[in-house]
Amino acid sequence: MAKFTQHTGLVVPLDAANVDTDAIIPKQFLQKVTRTGFGQHLFHDWRFLDDAGQQPNPEFVLNKPHYKGASILLARENFGCGSSREHAPWALTDYGFKVVIAPSFADIFYGNSFNNQLLPVKLSDEEVDELFKLVDGQEGINFIVDLENQVVQAGSKSYPFEIDSFRRHCMINGLDSIGLTLQHEASITEYEKNQPAFLN
């Protein structure tokens, strides 16, 4: 996976709480098991007025011209709730998002995000309120998300955030479960050499 140390990106405000995984990527688009191709269906029922996805909803925030190319999603509490599907972070990253900022996340979505190099940043309700006001008052604003120093730079203010040290290490070094295993390849090989033949 790609390393994540710091990201500067355009912020799009999705002013909704309890955004569930079926809203993020509706079930009819879950036929594939590869990670690509889901971005076009992200928030399908909100982005489009028709089932075929040919008529964009001009009122939906992702369809606003000044948010084209956004890579940081600002949302409300309990983001990613609902059924467990890894396709949700797949759709977000395939669309181009690198970071989701919210007061809270559903546990399974939170874990799946790290596994797919999508950084979920938890800030307080009050801090998220401030960020919504900032974005609403200044369309096209960029935030700097610094994972190494665990801080979001938004305008003239900095917002520190907490993150598990192991997950932080994995994202900074671009490590998934396979990458973590390969870090210990020499030790694994040495261990296998010392095992009885019938165990190999």
Swiss-Prot record:
Q: What does the subunit section of this Swiss-Prot or TrEMBL entry state?
A: Heterodimer of LeuC and LeuD.
Q: Does the keyword Calcium apply?
A: no
The protein's matches in Pfam families, at most eight in alphabetical order, are given as: Aconitase_C (PF00694)
Record protein name field:
3-isopropylmalate dehydratase small subunit
Q: Which taxonomic lineage does the organism of this UniProt entry have?
A: Bacteria, Pseudomonadati, Pseudomonadota, Gammaproteobacteria, Enterobacterales
Q: Which organism is it from?
A: Pectobacterium carotovorum subsp. carotovorum (strain PC1)
Give the record's keywords alphabetically: Amino-acid biosynthesis, Branched-chain amino acid biosynthesis, Leucine biosynthesis, Lyase
Biological process (GO) annotations held by this record are: L-leucine biosynthetic process
> One GO cellular component from the entry?
3-isopropylmalate dehydratase complex
Q: What is its EC number?
A: 4.2.1.33
